[in-house]
Curated annotation (Swiss-Prot):
Keywords: Carbohydrate metabolism, Oxidoreductase
Descriptive protein name: F420-dependent glucose-6-phosphate dehydrogenase
InterPro entries (UniProt xref): F420-dep_G6P_DH, F420-G6PD/mer, F420_G6P_DH-rel, Luciferase-like_dom, Luciferase-like_sf
Binding site for substrate: 192, 195, 256, 280
PANTHER family linked to this entry: 5,10-METHYLENETETRAHYDROMETHANOPTERIN REDUCTASE, PTHR43244
Underlying gene: fgd
Superkingdom, taxonomy of origin: Bacteria
Length: 333
C-alpha cells in the first residue's frame, strides 16, 4: 500500500516551527511525519538541532492520525539502548501507538561531541546496532531482563509502562549488507533517494527481499521507506535555489561520517557548485515532471515515500506539493 510522508527538517528549523509543519502535513493529507535526531546540525549558519525525543510527543499531542518516526536515531553511542526503549514505549502510549523507531549506525558529527571517543569502523557500528535492537525489543516484551552483550549490559531491567504492541523498528541502510538485515530484523527499511536507480533495483531491494525471506516473511511484510529529496516549486528557479542549504547531502558518505563539527561540514558543503548540489534532488516545477522522476522508486518496490523539501518556506512546499503532486501520486498507488 502506498503511503506518503513528510520529513521535518530538524537541521534547518527550530522545534516550534517544525511542530507546525507536522500539523500542516496531517492537514494536507499525508500519512506520516519523520524527523532526524542530530546533536549537531549539518550547517553552522542557520543550522538547528532540536531533540527528536522532545519534539515527537509535542507532535503527537497536536495530531490525531499521522505516524511519527525517527529517520533516523542512533541508539548506540549517545544513548543507552534501554533508555531509547523506555522513551519509545512512553511515546507509543502517549500517541496511541503512532510512533516508529527508525534507527541507523550513526555519524561521527553527532556522537563524538558527547563522548570524545574515536569514531569506530563500520563493523563495530553495525554490531552495536544489532545488539541494541535485540536489547530494545527484549525490554518491550519481557520482564526483569538480564542482558550481557559485547557492548551493553542490563541487570533485572524492566519497563513498567509499555504498549501492548511493541513499537515498529525501521532500519536504515545504504548498502546491501544492512539492507538484508533490515529485511530480516526490521518492521521497516529506510533509505534515501538520489544515488542512482541501480542501487535500489540491483542491491537494496533484492537484499531486503532476501532478508525478509530468511525470516520467513515476504518483502510486503516490510514497510519499504525512502526519503525522497524533492525540491518542488511552481517557480523553477526557486526550486533550484532551494537546494543550496542542503549542500551537505552532496558530500560523500566517507566525508560525512568523519566530520566532527558543523563548521567543517558547512565549509566542505559550500565548496560544491549548485549543479552538483542539485543532483541529489528531484528539482521540478511541473507536477507531471516530478511524478515521472518519483515513479521509478515505486517501480523498484518502495511503498512508503517520505518527501523532504529543502526550501525555507515549508508552508509553501506543503501547499504546492499537496495540491499539485500528491493527487497524482495517490493515483499511482
Amino acid at each position: 500500500m502506498l503511503k506518503v510522508g513528510y520529513k521535518a527538517s530538524a537541521e534547518q528549523f527550530g522545534p516550534r516551527d517544525l511542530v507546525e509543519y507536522a500539523v500542516r502535513a496531517e492537514e494536507v493529507g499525508l500519512d506520516s511525519v519523520w524527523v532526524s535526531d542530530h546533536f549537531l546540525p549539518w550547517r553552522h549558519e542557520g543550522g538547528h538541532a532540536p531533540w527528536a525525543l522532545a519534539w515527537m510527543p509535542a507532535v503527537a499531542e497536536r495530531t490525531k492520525r499521522v505516524q511519527i518516526g525517527t529517520s533516523v536515531l542512533t541508539p548506540t553511542f549517545r544513548y543507552n539502548p534501554a533508555v531509547i526503549a523506555q522513551a519509545f514505549a512512553t511515546m507509543s502510549l502517549l500517541s496511541n501507538g503512532r510512533v516508529i523507531l527508525g534507527v541507523g549506525s550513526g555519524e561521527a558529527l553527532n556522537e563524538i561531541a558527547v563522548s570524545g571517543r574515536e569514531w569506530p569502523e563500520f563493523k563495530e557500528r553495525f554490531a552495536r546496532l544489532r545488539e541494541s535492537i535485540k536489547l530494545i525489543r527484549e525490554l518491550w516484551t519481557s520482564d526483569n531482563v538480564n542482558f550481557k552483550g559485547d557492548y551493553y549490559e542490563l541487570v533485572d531491567a524492566k519497563i513498567y509502562d509499555r504498549p501492548e504492541q511493541p513499537v515498529p523498528v525501521y532500519i536504515a541502510a545504504g548498502g546491501p549488507v544492512v539492507a538484508k538485515y533490515a529485511g530480516r530484523a526490521g518492521d521497516g527499511f529506510i533509505c534515501t533517494s538520489g544515488k542512482g536507480m541501480e542501487l535500489y533495483t540491483d542491491k537494496l531491494m533484492p537484499a531486503v527481499k532476501e532478508g525478509a525471506e530468511a525470516a520467513e516473511k515476504t518483502v510486503e511484510d516490510v514497510d519499504r521507506t525512502i526519503e525522497i529529496k524533492l525540491s518542488y516549486d511552481r517557480d523553477h528557479e526557486k526550486a533550484l535555489e532551494n537546494t543550496r542549504f542542503w549542500a551537505p547531502l552532496s558530500l560523500s558518505a566517507e566525508q560525512k561520517h568523519s566530520v566532527s563539527s558543523a563548521e567543517e561540514m558547512e565549509r566542505l558543503a559550500d565548496e560544491l557548485p549548485i549543479d552538483q548540489v542539485a543532483k541529489r534532488w528531484i528539482v521540478a516545477s511541473d507536477p507531471d515532471e516530478a511524478v515521472a522522476q518519483i515513479k521509478p522508486y515505486l517501480d523498484a518496490g518502495l511503498n512508503h515515500l517520505v518527501f523532504h523539501g529543502p526550501g525555507h518556506d515549508q508552508e509553501r512546499f506543503l501547499t504546492q506539493f499537496s495540491e499539485d503532486v500528491l493527487p497524482k501520486l495517490r493515483a499511482l498507488g
